[in-house]
Each structure stands twice: as C-alpha cells, then as structure tokens.
C-alpha cells in the first residue's frame, strides 16, 4: 500500500458527528501515551498530522483521519487512550461510553489496531480492551510499540510476555513489534490494513 495523501477530517463524540461517505475504517486503541500519535504520523508519513504529547490523556475525542492510498481510501480513527488515572471518574465513564458506542455500532469499522507498550507486560486495561475486541469479533492487529528501546535479541521475550497474558493464537489476531523511530514493520502494518479494507 502506498499512501498518496492523508488529512485530519473530524473529531467526534457521538454518531451524528461521524464522517459520511461510506469509507471503511480502522480504529486505533491503546493506553494513554502508548505512542498512537507517533504511530499515525509514521504510518501516514506526515510529521505533525497527529499531535504528539508527553502528557497522557490529551486525546478526548474520536479523531478521524482520511487516508487516500493506491489501493483504497479509508479512515484511520484514533480512539481516546484508556488507563489514564488523572481524569475524573465521570470523564472515564464518558470516554468508555463513546468508545463502546463506536466499536459496537459502526458498520464501516473493519478492524482494530491495539497498541501496547512493548517495554512492559500488558496491563489489566490492555487485557480488558483485547478481550472486549475479541468479544466484538473484530480483526485485531496487536502492535508492541517503542521496540527501538528494546534490544533485538529480547523481541522474543516481549512476544512471549504478550502470549502469556493474551490469547494470540486466534485466527483474527496478528502480532507485530513496531517502532516509530526505526520504522520497524511499517509496511507490514499497511499490508494488514489493506487486507481488512472492503473485505466481505
């Protein structure tokens, strides 16, 4: 897949604000500060398309990015990060409802890229999101982020830790180590997305 053009489209907190037009969508989920913005910028080859921040909890809406590629046009949808303790309980509940409504009702959603910090074992929140995506029967790309901070000979240890906590043996799950710094597996992510688009 070759990305020809990409742009921020719209922020939404409810279904009436979602973009129209019938394009397929791929959602991005992960803990706050897991590296979703860097992932988007790296994948779409745009330096500051998604704003990166050292402060977790910045994304508080569903952010839709329209992507035009040589294969198909689609939306990449950045979902608010979970597991951020400094937002109020009420805000966490609102985020949860917004994410749930989108993941459970959006007909154009074709898959979920779940991002987990590869330097650590999956958290309780990571496992809950993974199990929820399995419950919804969504195709899942499990991305271990920040792998440039891990020695290459420890990659197998990272994958083993993920396999210990998550059932990665399902047909609808793909695991990839990833780095926005070294561009590790960027093409493989694009291949996974391409395979999801407009499949029946």
Curated annotation (Swiss-Prot):
GTP binds at residues 30-37, 57-61, 78-81, 145-148, 178-180. One of its GO terms (molecular function) is metal ion binding. Keywords: Cell cycle, Cell division, GTP-binding, Magnesium, Metal-binding, Nucleotide-binding, Septation. GO terms for biological process: division septum assembly. Gene3D superfamilies: P-loop containing nucleotide triphosphate hydrolases. Transmembrane segments: none annotated. Mg(2+) binds at residues 37, 59. Residues 22-199 form the EngB-type G domain. The keyword Nucleotidyltransferase does not apply. Its cofactor is Mg(2+). One of its GO terms (cellular component) is cytosol. Belongs to the TRAFAC class TrmE-Era-EngA-EngB-Septin-like GTPase superfamily. EngB GTPase family. Necessary for normal cell division and for the maintenance of normal septation. This is Probable GTP-binding protein EngB. It comes from Lactobacillus delbrueckii subsp. bulgaricus (strain ATCC 11842 / DSM 20081 / BCRC 10696 / JCM 1002 / NBRC 13953 / NCIMB 11778 / NCTC 12712 / WDCM 00102 / Lb 14). The gene is engB.
